Amino acid sequence: MTIQLEVCIDNLESLHYAQQGGASRIELCSSLALGGLTPSAGFMQLAAKHASIPVYAMIRPRQGDFLFSSDDVEIMLADIHAAKKAQLQGVVIGVLTQEGHIDRDILNSLMKEANGLGVTFHRAIDQCIDPMAALDNIMAAGCERILTSGLQANALDGVDMIAEMVTYCGDNLSIMAGAGVTATNAKQIITRTGIREIHLSGKSTRPSHMVQFANQAHMGSADIDDFSIPVTSVEKISAVINAIR
């Protein structure tokens, strides 16, 4: 059984590293530190140019919850259009109601705009109060997969729920495990759940290439080092590939 390995990235440098490591698919984001937000149109275009594997763009206009306003939805529709224009292979979406259910109306609107693209429903499902009803709605909308940690903080802790989802959906929806997946636990997660897809960042950092700079002014939170650049690790991705063979 071939296992698909999706790598989430938020810069073009990481795209090259993910491909070198053996990734099967890219989830294209900005701001992975915030859980992943929508990448820019320029990033989408350059990713499409340089990728030799499928690229799915995250469609998430802001950090925080998955209860989106009409303005948010308008942005999401425009961003899906941008992903199409960039000739990406798919998008990653997720929308909830105030009560913690799938927002079927918004999901159907997004799916209509995404016609012709592959669609992953992201970890918004991990904040649903009734995950099996959520799966029914996601399948009915026409999504091809979900990304989930089994409603837990990480996929290893959520293996029982993930396995239940796999059984429930059968061949109607692919279940992809993500959150905390590493070379150490990937094989165990696959064996215990029956999944055929895993998701990870394989992140590391590299130092800035700047040789002179003033370092007293922070561009964001003071606890974030502006001169340490997050990038995908070729070695970490390769290690996961080797672990699941």
UniProtKB/Swiss-Prot annotation:
Organism: Photobacterium profundum (strain SS9)
Main subcellular location of this protein, as a coarse class: cytoplasm
Gene field: cutC
Keyword hit for Cytoplasm: yes
Name of the protein: PF03932 family protein CutC
InterPro entries: CutC-like, CutC-like_dom_sf
Subcellular localization(s) per the UniProt record: Cytoplasm
GO CC terms, sorted: cytoplasm
SUPFAM superfamilies linked to this entry: CutC-like (SSF110395)
Family: Belongs to the CutC family.
GO molecular function term, any single one: copper ion binding
Sorted UniProt keywords: Cytoplasm
Stored PANTHER family: COPPER HOMEOSTASIS PROTEIN CUTC (PTHR12598), COPPER HOMEOSTASIS PROTEIN CUTC HOMOLOG (PTHR12598:SF0)
